[in-house]
A protein has these predicted regions:
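RNA-binding accessory domains that recognize and position tRNA/RNA substrates
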Residues: 1-191, 195-229, 243, 251, ...
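Catalytic beta-strand/loop cores that center a nucleophilic Ser/Cys/Thr
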Residues: 311-353, 389
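Proline-centered loop/turn at the N-terminus of a beta-strand
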Residues: 107, 191, 272-274, 290, ...
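Active-site-proximal beta-strand elements of phosphoester/diester hydrolases
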Residues: 191-196, 316-317, 356-360
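A glycine-centered loop/beta-turn motif at secondary-structure junctions
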Residues: 347-389
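Short, flexible hinge/linker loops that cap or flank conserved catalytic cores
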Residues: 184-188, 267, 349-350
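Cysteine-nucleophile active-site neighborhood
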Residues: 233, 237-323, 367-385
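Short clusters of small/polar residues that mark proteolytic maturation junctions
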Residues: 18-19, 56, 318, 340, ...
């Protein structure tokens, strides 16, 4: 393998070997603590614009399994591992990870001290970086560092969202027709609109398990477009980037909130809302809350959160670099979950309308299923609302 280098914005250089595509890439360097689930990480749209470091030292053991993908492609900017397995073993394996990275044109680096890198990011905060391969040694000049520092994740939701409305058997993973997690049955009880800001495949899977018809719509849809579909519930999906950048979407979510407030006042049908990750942040912003960037984010499948009402602690899967500020929440926004490590907001219940949201991923693919019951709560909100009207 040829040499590769990771150059951080502060001038720190890590030397390793090239994996995946050869070339260079710039992104926000982050780390994830997941021991497994690297395929879900690679195909999670929430990693758009980021160079992802796997803290677990050996990656690729079970190869590439298309059934485990969480979106149509890799959206991350680069990939960092300590050691890449070249001889995977799994009865479902279709190729090795290095070949897949090449096919997705993902520039990566292996054989670096990922523990030292993770400690640096933990102590200094996430920072931009550049992976360079195919050269003997990088020339570290101010112009290069300025280029790295200037990088910003932009147009993230626009890039990862679906471009068209999908429903029923249209919503199939095109490249792998044998996968049926987006083929829905016909005996539906309820209709849910999934507003796609970078949705992982496991979100509609979980809704379909609960006998819901799921209509996936692009980020560019308006509140009126969604209400014309006459949904029983609205799911606000996960996604990448700074939530505050999505001013247009936030304004449309505010209209949905106002629709529910008006419907409740007039005795009409309300539409329950459930937000996950970015969807949680966007709903909070639409309701007057504020968000801020975390020092190094929460990424991985082992993050403890505490439920305020019961005091129970759940282990959750997380992938976010921003959080809703807990201080001075509006009176109608009740803190439902908080992070046991740093006390940041992990969930909000809105008392004036049938809406709630969580920062973590209850669909957890990969990761723990401790909070899978939140999908049941969403469905129950919908059924209760339908029965009441």
């Amino acid at each position: 393998m040829s040499k590769a280098f990771l150059v951080l914005a502060d001038g720190t250089v890590f030397e390793g070997t090239s994996i995946g595509a050869e070339g260079s890439t710039i992104g926000e360097t982050v780390f994830t603590t997941g021991m497994t689930g690297y395929l879900e990480t690679l195909t999670d749209p929430s990693y758009f614009g980021q160079i992802v470091t796997q803290t677990f030292p050996l990656i690729g053991n079970y190869g590439v399994i298309p059934e485990d993908f969480e979106s149509r492609k890799c959206f991350l900017k680069g990939y960092i591992v300590r050691e890449l397995c070249s001889l995977p073993s799994n009865f479902r394996c279709q190729s090795d990870l290095d070949s897949y990275l090449k096919s997705q044109n993902i520039v990566g680096i292996a054989e670096i001290d990922t523990r030292a890198l993770t400690k640096k990011l933990r102590e200094s905060g996430v920072m931009n970086g550049m992976i360079i391969s195919g050269i003997e040694k990088p020339v570290i000049e101010n112009s290069l560092l300025e280029k790295i520092k200037a990088y910003r994740v932009e147009q993230s939701v626009e890039t990862v969202s679906t471009s068209t409305q999908l429903s029923e058997k249209q919503n199939v993973v095109k490249d792998y027709p044998e996968i049926n997690h987006h083929i829905f049955h016909s005996d539906k009880q309820i209709k849910i609109v999934l507003w796609d800001f970078g949705a992982k495949y496991n979100i509609p899977r979980e809704l379909e398990k609960r006998n819901a018809e799921v209509i996936t719509v692009p980020y560019s849809y308006t509140a009126d477009d969604i209400l014309k579909l006459d949904p029983d519930g609205i799911m606000l999906s996960n996604g990448p980037g700074d939530p505050a950048d999505n001013t247009g979407v936030i304004a449309e979510i505010a209209k949905l909130v106002q629709y529910n407030i008006d419907a409740q006042a007039s005795g009409k049908k309300m539409v329950p809302i459930f937000g996950i990750c970015l969807g949680h942040q966007l709903l909070a912003l639409a309701r007057g809350c504020k968000t801020s960037k975390l020092k190094y984010g929460h990424r991985g499948g082992n993050h403890p959160v505490k439920e305020v009402e019961t005091g129970r602690v759940f282990i959750t899967s997380q992938n976010h670099g921003y959080a809703v500020q807990c201080d001075n929440l509006p009176s109608f926004a009740k803190l439902a979950f908080y992070n046991s490590n740093d006390k940041t907001c992990e969930g909000i219940t809105y008392t004036d309308i049938p809406a709630f949201s969580v920062q973590f991923h209850p669909e957890a693919c990969g990761g723990p299923h401790d909070t899978n019951f939140l999908f049941d709560k969403f469905i129950q909100n919908i059924l209760t609302n339908k029965e009441a009207k």
